[in-house]
Amino acid sequence: MTALFTAPSVDEIIAKLGAQSTCDAGLTQDPWHFDTTTPSYGPGASMLDRLPANAPCQQVLPDEYRKASDEELQQRISDAKQRLGSKLLILGHFYQRDEIIKHADFVGDSFQLAKNATERPDADHIVFCGVHFMAETADILSTPEQSVTLPNLSAGCSMADMANIDQVQECWDQLGEICGTQPDSDGLQQIIPVTYMNSSAALKAFCGRNGGIVCTSSNAHAVLEWAFARGKRVLFFPDQHLGRNTARAMGIPLSEMPLWDPFKAQGGAADPADYARAKMILWKGFCSVHQRFTVEQVERARKAYPGVKVIVHPECSMQVVDAADGTGSTAYIVKEIANAPAGSAIAVGTEINLVNRLAAQYPDKTVFCLDPVVCPCSTMYRIHPAYLAWALENLEAGNVVNRITVDEDTAREAKVALERMLRVHP
């Protein structure tokens, strides 16, 4: 009789891989501790990134929520959700902690949740358990009568903050001087702007009014095909790695993918003509979680688990993607693990909350995070059940707290770019 395969625990896997510590001792503290300290992204992967001076800050959470037990918070969330009924829609990103995901009506990546935001026009309130740019997108795509709440206003995104509208406009103007602004003889635009979903509403609006489009990690290939059918080159922001990995998979050589550094004169190129010769101009931005993954970690996983399958998110570096067996969005990663045969070992290069959830969901498989010093997304971590309970009970009382609103002009232009994306990938 064949013995039942039992996957090792995450702790056992981490020990086998040689981890000695967590990302930061501050992770053991409740997130409301950081509501009264100097604003930052920490603790977590983004803790060393620069927080913009105008980043929204969360108000201090009332004592009754901070002091409530885990059990009480879960019960209060469930009760409030039941009482609000069909008036409420809760969206949860894959990277949220399990105590939040269990209450979500829809769980997915940013592309899936953007679509989900349009599917319940009967709901008065959308509570988005994710980060700021996702809630902005929900506000843009939902009806004017619906409110969108982000339970913790400090749940931002360091990558999204790596490109602001002033920087992008300056880049656009300089590239116009280098590449020209008039269509070529075939009617192709000189540059098509493409922004990753992980960006502000202002950048989505910029794309909308300049013939551009939004993409996600699940549809980047299709979006770039759309863009190259309309333009000679693409300005891709804010994540250089997704742009590079996708364009390279489409056959574009690295020599035609110069980097634009917003903190250097003319983007930092030794020769500005490099941008005129380019097919993909990549903004110098990155995800702090995915930038932690290394080729050395891939090699270590293969040594520890011979035959392991390595799958990573395309926000990882090109070198890590090349060393892996597969790359794709969080939805792709979920599907790959679900379809893997029992007894499989799968090393995953993405955020730890999702990896842990998949490891628990598939105990007949060994699913573990490539990064042995496990480090969550700093800002996804900010959505704690205490904030969700506080937001829902305020909605019950008729108070819409932490409402995310995008001004009418920005929303109109951003919606153009988002709807182009939705038509490319329905």
Where are these predicted regions, by residue range?
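Active-site loop-to-helix "anion-binding N-cap" substructures in soluble metabolic enzymes
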Residues: T2-V348, L354-P426
